[in-house]
Amino acid sequence: MTNTKYYPEVSSNADFAAIEREILKFWQDNNIFQKSIDDRNGESEFIFYDGPPFANGLPHYGHLLTGFIKDVYARYQTVKGKKVERRFGWDCHGLPAEMQSEKELGISGRLAITNFGIEKFNSHCRASVMKYASDWEEYVTRQARWVDFKNSYKTMDKNFMESVIWAFKELYNKGLLYESMRVMPYSWACETPLSNFETRLDNSYRERADKAVTVSFVLNEIPAINGMTSRESGTTSSGDYKEYRILAWTTTPWTLPSNLALAVGSDIDYASIPKEDICYIIAASSVSKYAKELGLSGEENFEIIKGSALQGLSYKPLFDYFANHPNSFKIFAGDFVVEGDGTGIVHMAPGFGEDDQILCESKGISLVCPVDNSGKFTKEIPDLEGVQVFDANDKIIIKLKEQGNWLKTEQYIHNYPHCWRTDTPLIYKAVPSWYVKVTQFKDRMVELNQQINWIPFHVKDNLFGKWLENARDWSISRNRFWGTPLPVWKSDDPKYPRIDVYGSIEELEKDFGVKVTDLHRPFIDELARPNPNDPTGKSTMRRIEDVFDCWFESGSMPYGQAHYPFENKKWFEDHFPADFIVEYSAQTRGWFYTLMVLSTALFDRPPFLNCICHGVILDATGQKLSKRLNNYADPLELFDKYGSDALRVTMLSSNVVKGQELLIDKDGKMVFDTLRLFIKPIWNAYHFFTMYANADSLKGELNFASQNVLDIYILSKLKIAVNKIEESLDNFDTQTAYHAVSEFFEVLNNWYIRRSRARFWKSEKDADKQNAYNTLYSCLETMAIAMSALVPMISEAIYLGLCHKRPDVIARKDLSLDEAISGNSHEIATALSVPRNDGSISVHLCNYPNLSSFEINHELVATMDNVLDICSNSLFIRSTENIRVRQPLATITIISKHNDKLKSFEDLIKDEINVKSVIYRDDLENYASKKLSINFPMLGKRLPAKMKEIIAASKKGEWEAIGGGLAICDETLNSDEYKLVLEPHVHIKGAASFENNSSLLILDLELTAELIEEGYARDIVRFIQQARKDADFSITDRILIEIISEFDLSKIIDNYGDFIKEQTLGEFSKNFTPDYVSKVELENHQIQLKVKRS
């Protein structure tokens, strides 16, 4: 009679990468992703915003990490019954695209691009920006992330761009935009300013060595000392000085040709230091740093001048480039001047310093900026014209020495901002730009931020919250080419000023009388019209050349993707704000921030309600992953080797989801460990079920009605795990969710299945056996659904393998996993399309398990967990003492207050840890004592002054446990400030505590001859079972056994022969031709085993 097999033949040594490829094909062939959206009616939606990446480079591990997190919560919310649209998006504009195009075209700089032709350059950008789009789709699909590529949005699409210019005009109409010439971080390599938050991206600050120079400025007036000039004060040196010089220190010598003022601190004490016939003025606190240069011994006393007394003095210009600049070359007080580095005097070049500009403009000094867009000096500095500013430092220092203004040059190592695209050092430079008045509504952003749930929580009030509190106005214009143009037209004649701002294509077409098919440069630049405010009709309205900062476009994603407000108005209003977004932590200065600015300014709402800030992935040595360093493997290689589920678990079960770093090795050992320790146990449980169910021709059913104590226990643990996964994912905590899965399968495999083997092995197909199959089936199917977001492909494979409820599949007697999920034949495809009872053909179309009708037996769980604790501790003692598990021991003594409950599991304990008897006691004090362990970091924060006293008392045992706390030194310690550890008395061997240090077990480690003999018998059983497996016998095959040994086993066979035969389905025999022969070793003696199917 042929066995009916209801389940696929599942290999215990599965090729998970191959399984995943089959699952991906099943999803594609059956359009499962789209079904997961269509099956939800939309009454309840989970709104998710997908931050747009650039497609001009391949995805890296950081992208995959973000993608895994996005996919987990999208899948989870789907099985929770919500509709989750997942529209992909592409960031297309900005420096990344332009820099790549310049490289590919072999040109560099604004002038070269203009000569090449803006239209041709932007056409190249348009083509190259999607260069890796197909690769992105391959990576994203292979990582089992479901997204809608077909309807993806692009920031370069006309509709998206129109929404961006709408937002600009809205801000303009609200009075939240202004144009200004301000000092900003400036990338001379990209020839464009950067916003202040761009300098905080991706560790843009790094260590750099610069030449710092100390320069002397010659005063035109004699400073007052104690309200008098030195001559009036009667000091001995009065009148002896040829010059008074004030010393300033700077790390940017190249800005000195643009010096227009000096700043001092009003309340700072300055010393007047004579050297020959010159008196130098410097902050008193800095004198010692210049002892050598000023010829000081360290014993001198100096006249002190308050900074306020220096205010208003004038000085001679260092150079004559701007010598006639109005209101310049004076000393002013600045609240930003502090003592420390330098001289306590700050040189002011308002074209290259933000504080400089603010102070100088307040004193009527207009800025000068003799540096061009490429960071080179202009003709205003004729002897340095065309020299790059950093290359000019040495030339300027030489000139200072020649003039007699130089005092000192030193190497200064400091953290300095670099361009996030070119890695070149930035300069600070005055440039014209359009700004969003963020400072006008930053307090409102701080308020709205309180409505957002941040993960980790501290981001809310620290990393992001502090950034919002200190927000500055945002420069949103860039003098570049490939981007959404600022919709601003100005009169080209200042006599007839006029500014027009446009917020739609319709407005443009109405005013300019042309059909607008492309908003990009140069087409938009060609739109011009007569200035309505010019009665002469000679001036023209022309567009300013700037384009938007691409971060403005990214921040416009919520409405830009919907072409709001021109289309989809209702859709946008129903899908704003987002329920969830995720990116890495630096986006608190990037995308998260720009979303917040625009959402607050335009809608007075937070842009998202839940946000995960994950950490970064580094190599095994803590270095950034880099192609140049060749320190990481192509993710596709890992997928092909271990599968993407394993990488997903590796990443999302680590601290990287809590904003910390994850170090990943190039060879993928960490991913292999995840496969071995997390994925394989899940698969092993599934393999066990299918193997034995097929052998018995039995089907499992979803059934929670068994009264078997092990079944009730594991089903209770199942519900606990399902609830914990749900609770964790509701709280955006994948770490805890993965731990719940791992913990459950640890108990399922190493406790439930192992303790239930006899029920699966026995030949009788009774109710107890069916209950065992139903229970294991229920665990597997329920967990497949519960963990489907966490391990989407392995869950799907298991779910499809358990498809025996479908009539078409039941008819197949030899259905394999590959056949079940490949859809290679009409019959199989039909089978996979037959709905389950809940209408689901895929695990990802199911509803999250609802186990409300099953009550957890908490008392049983607590007791069984104690039993498990007893057994695991006993096995650990065996391992420590080098006593193998198959070697029986005489007794275990259990000392506990819950012996009555434990006694009902005595046979289980004896069998599991292989002891002959259990002794119960309750006199714990005779065997162990409690030792107090202090949590020093925790308690030290609360009671730092009493720590020594508490430590001494704890060592003396001068404490008392009271209620939920502990009394010591007139203080009551909280539960998280201490732990009571149960320590066995020194003379007791083989002991361990359990039940939270409230109980003790003691194993009798003495081995008698009878015990040793029985241990050998169990070893022989193991040898035979391994031979059966190696011979590829079925688990139901009966066999013949012959044992040939130099070791006398006759007594063992006589005493334990029946036990050996029962355990191995065998009979002892001789003179047969074996199917398999193995050689093993027992106590250093060789044994030959022969086995044959009988």
From Swiss-Prot:
Cofactor(s) essential for the protein: Zn(2+)
Gene Ontology terms for molecular function: aminoacyl-tRNA deacylase activity; ATP binding; isoleucine-tRNA ligase activity; tRNA binding; zinc ion binding
Assigned GO CC terms: cytoplasm
Keywords recorded for this protein, A-Z: Aminoacyl-tRNA synthetase, ATP-binding, Cytoplasm, Ligase, Metal-binding, Nucleotide-binding, Protein biosynthesis, Zinc
Cellular location(s): Cytoplasm
Major localization listed first in the record, in broad terms: cytoplasm
Domain of life, source organism: Bacteria
Keyword Protein biosynthesis: yes
Motif 'HIGH' region positions after renumbering to this chain: 53-63
A single BP term in Gene Ontology: isoleucyl-tRNA aminoacylation
Motif ('KMSKS' region): 624-628
CDD domains for the chain: Anticodon_Ia_Ile_ABEc, IleRS_core
Catalyzed chemical reaction(s): tRNA(Ile) + L-isoleucine + ATP = L-isoleucyl-tRNA(Ile) + AMP + diphosphate
Function according to Swiss-Prot or TrEMBL: Catalyzes the attachment of isoleucine to tRNA(Ile). As IleRS can inadvertently accommodate and process structurally similar amino acids such as valine, to avoid such errors it has two additional distinct tRNA(Ile)-dependent editing activities. One activity is designated as 'pretransfer' editing and involves the hydrolysis of activated Val-AMP. The other activity is designated 'posttransfer' editing and involves deacylation of mischarged Val-tRNA(Ile).
Subunit structure: Monomer.
Family the UniProt entry places it in: Belongs to the class-I aminoacyl-tRNA synthetase family. IleS type 2 subfamily.
Protein name: Isoleucine--tRNA ligase
Origin species: Rickettsia felis (strain ATCC VR-1525 / URRWXCal2) (Rickettsia azadi)
Gene: ileS
